[in-house]
Amino acid sequence: LKGELTEGAGPGIDVYSIRQPLGVVAGITPFNFPAMIPLWKAGPALACGNAFILKPSERDPSVPVRLAELFTEAGLPPGAFQVVQGDKEAVDALLDHPDIKAYGFVGSSDIAQYIYSRAAANGKRSQCFGGAKNHMIVMPDADLDQAVDALVGAGYGSAGERCMAISVAVPVGEETANRLRARLAERIKDLRVGHSLDPKADYGPLVTAAALTRVRGYIDAGVTEGAELVVDGRKKGSDEMTFGDESLEGGFFIGPSLFDHVT
C-alpha cells in the first residue's frame, strides 16, 4: 500500500509510485466454503480502501448474509460490504457494470475462464482461481499408513466437494498399488455417511440433487469405460458402505467409492 521509490533512476531523476483504491470490487464465490472464501476476498479489498460486493453461490446464500450483518455490527460504514444474490444473470450484471473495477473468483475451471474472459473484454481486472483437484504420487518406500490417512481425509472429507480434494492416487509399482488398494478399501468401507452435525459421521451430503446425479454419473461412466470399481458408493445399505442413520434416505447422500485401473 505504500508504493515504491527509486532514487537515481536517471541523471537527476527519482521515480516513485503510489497505490490507490480501485473503488468498487466484487467477489464471486463458491458454495463449499461460504464464509472462508468470501473473507479471503473481502478482507484485503476493504483493507485497501475499496467497497466490496459479494455474489455468493445461490446454493447456500444465508452465510454471506450473516457475514454482512457481522460487518455492520462491527461498525463498517453502510454500503462498504454488500451481498447480491442470484445466478449467472447476477454475475453477468456485475461483470458488465461500468463502476465495478475488479473481480475475484473461486470455483470451477470453466466458470473461471468465462469470468476472466468477460472481465477482460470489459477492460476489468480479475483474479480467477479455477479447478484445483490434486494428485498424490505414492512411492514404494512411502509410509502407507500416512498415505492412506491423507487420501481418505482429502478425498472423502466434505464429500469431496472442495478444491483441496485428492481425487487421484498414482502408486509407483504394482506391489505398491496392491498394498495401497487393500488398505484404502478397508478404510473406506468403514466410513460413515450422515448429517454434517453428527459427530459420528465422517462426511455429510452432497450440496444438491444435481450434484448427487452428477457423481452417480461419474461412477456409472467409470464402470462403462472399463475401470475396476473396488468400492461402490451407490449401494445404500449394502456391505460396501454404512449410513449412520436410516432416516437419511432421500437425502443427497452417496457412499465413498474407489476405482482401480483407471486409464
Regions found by a protein language model. Give the residues of each.
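Rossmann-like NAD(P) dinucleotide-binding subdomain of oxidoreductase/dehydrogenase enzymes
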Residues: G3-V148
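ALDH superfamily catalytic-core signature
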Residues: D96, A102, D110-T263
